[in-house]
UniProtKB/Swiss-Prot annotation:
Cofactor binding mode and count: Binds 2 Mg(2+) ions per subunit.
Protein name stated in the entry: Ribose-phosphate pyrophosphokinase
Organism: Xylella fastidiosa (strain Temecula1 / ATCC 700964)
InterPro entries (UniProt xref): PRib_PP_synth_CS, Pribosyltran_N, PRibTrfase_dom, PRTase-like, Rib-P_diPkinase, Rib-P_diPkinase_bac
Assigned GO CC terms: cytoplasm; ribose phosphate diphosphokinase complex
Family from the record: Belongs to the ribose-phosphate pyrophosphokinase family. Class I subfamily.
Active-site residue list: K201
Record's function text: Involved in the biosynthesis of the central metabolite phospho-alpha-D-ribosyl-1-pyrophosphate (PRPP) via the transfer of pyrophosphoryl group from ATP to 1-hydroxyl of ribose-5-phosphate (Rib-5-P).
Major localisation: cytoplasm
UniProt: D-ribose 5-phosphate binding residues: R203, D227, D231, T232, A233, G234, T235
């Protein structure tokens, strides 16, 4: 990827949620990270100061809204506000992982908020001119924003690693649930139309354990589970057990966003999973970094190239043309 020789019109700032990723993006772009103070007052309120001139600059702010979600979202909002008040030309909110994305509907008409829309409206209202994110939980979330959204996909990065690590001779792509079939089918197609399997979870009746039915032939295969995020890893680990029981020789998972909350690490360490490959949209905890089953890929090059294309008015969608 060509580096940006002239930084006068492009600046990259970072919140505290994932500074290592921002540093990697800046390295790929050949620019330095913008100078800012992002901290908290003694009572916990956000404190932000932009420490250099940004007047008429095209600014990108990198901040995933991962845990602690409310704090990281608020931090993003006040950084954007500080930049807008400093007379930037435009601000793009680069949100590698968009938290609250699973709260995108009212389930069974319960009296609950659609929090994904609340967060999107806040980001739009504060003055963001554009949003750049990776693998939204649901593509329709783009419509919650009142500004343009570039939802880019980590699949090229994951596919390249699958080709390198496992080849395509004896693999089968597996969707861990019916809702992920479209994603899994697309991955299978890009891997040379490899076989596809689906795990159908259902509870036969009340007070009876959930049964996992495997749709597809996994016996003797290396199973590649694909999904957009892993949280407690309960479903993922149960899927690995079901696949091994049905004759799979190896079970690996490729997942974009490593939320990894609650009992996730215990579940993974004690699971039948042979490997879990994730990206750095969310920083890993110390326990996750030390886990021998977890391997992390970087989305820095993907985000840097997308930022470059946005800054120079080039096509983003052409990144995904075969």
């Amino acid at each position: 990827m060509p580096t940006i020789q002239d930084e006068r019109n492009l600046m990259v700032f970072s919140g505290n949620a994932n500074k290592p990723l921002t540093q990697s993006i800046c390295k790929e772009l050949g620019v330095r990270m913008g100078k800012s103070l992002v901290s908290r007052f003694s009572d916990g309120e956000e404190q932000v100061e932009i420490e250099e001139s940004v007047r008429r600059q095209e600014v990108f702010v990198v901040q995933p809204t991962c845990a602690p979600s409310a704090e990281n979202l608020m931090e993003l909002l006040v950084i954007i506000d500080a930049l807008k008040r400093a007379s930037v030309s435009s601000v793009t909110a680069v949100i590698p992982y968009f938290g609250y994305s699973r709260q995108d509907r009212r389930m069974r008409s319960l009296r609950v908020p659609i929090t994904a829309k609340v967060a999107a409206k806040m980001i739009s209202a504060i003055g963001a001119d554009r949003v750049l994110t990776i693998d939204l939980h649901a593509d329709q979330i783009q419509g919650f924003f009142d500004v343009p959204v570039d939802n880019v996909y980590a699949s090229p990065l994951l596919l390249a690693d699958i080709w390198r690590a496992y080849g395509t001779d004896n693999i089968i792509v597996v969707s861990p649930d019916v809702g992920g079939v479209v994603r899994a089918r697309a991955m299978a197609k890009r891997l040379g139309d490899t076989d596809l399997a689906i795990i159908d979870k259902r509870r036969p009746r009340a007070n009876v354990a959930t049964v996992m039915n495997i749709i597809g032939e996994v016996n003797g295969k290396t199973c590649v589970l694909v999904d957009d995020l892993v949280d407690t890893a309960g479903t993922l680990c149960a899927a690995a057990v079901a696949l091994k029981q049905n004759g799979a020789t190896k079970v690996v998972a490729y997942i974009t966003h490593p939320v990894l909350s609650g009992p996730a690490m215990d579940n993974i360490n004690n699971s039948e999973l042979d490997e879990l490959v994730v990206t750095d949209t969310i920083p890993l905890s110390d326990a996750a970094r030390e886990c021998r089953k977890i391997r992390q890929l970087s989305v820095a090059e993907l985000l840097a190239e997308t930022i470059r294309r946005i800054a120079f008015g080039e096509s983003v969608s052409s990144l995904y043309v075969d």
